[in-house]
């Protein structure tokens, strides 16, 4: 279902593609194909992915922005963001 929705969006040739949890409920193989599709789409347009699966995000190899209560908490490479103490405090409930 997600592929159909992403495909319908790409058919409209948008300058910005916003996808929410595109890998939800997918098998490992489907997640790999979705990663490739989004990486390819990002070559010709801006792609914003809202995702909680950090392994999926890691495979995208892109800049990550962590939001908390509507404000940017951290931004940068995934390894930088996941090592950020503010991010750890917020998401581990400290």
Task: Tell where the protein language model's regions lie, with residue ranges.
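Glycine-rich phosphate-binding loops of nucleotide-dependent enzymes
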Residues: 1-94
């Amino acid at each position: 279902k997600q592929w159909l929705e992403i495909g319908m969006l790409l058919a409209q040739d948008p300058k910005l593609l916003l996808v929410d949890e595109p890998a939800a409920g997918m098998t490992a193989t489907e997640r790999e194909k979705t990663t490739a599709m989004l990486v390819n789409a990002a070559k010709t347009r801006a792609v914003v992915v809202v995702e909680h699966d950090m392994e999926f995000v890691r495979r995208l190899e892109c800049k990550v922005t962590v939001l908390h209560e509507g404000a940017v908490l951290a931004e940068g490479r995934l390894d930088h963001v996941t090592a950020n103490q503010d991010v750890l405090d917020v998401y581990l409930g400290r």
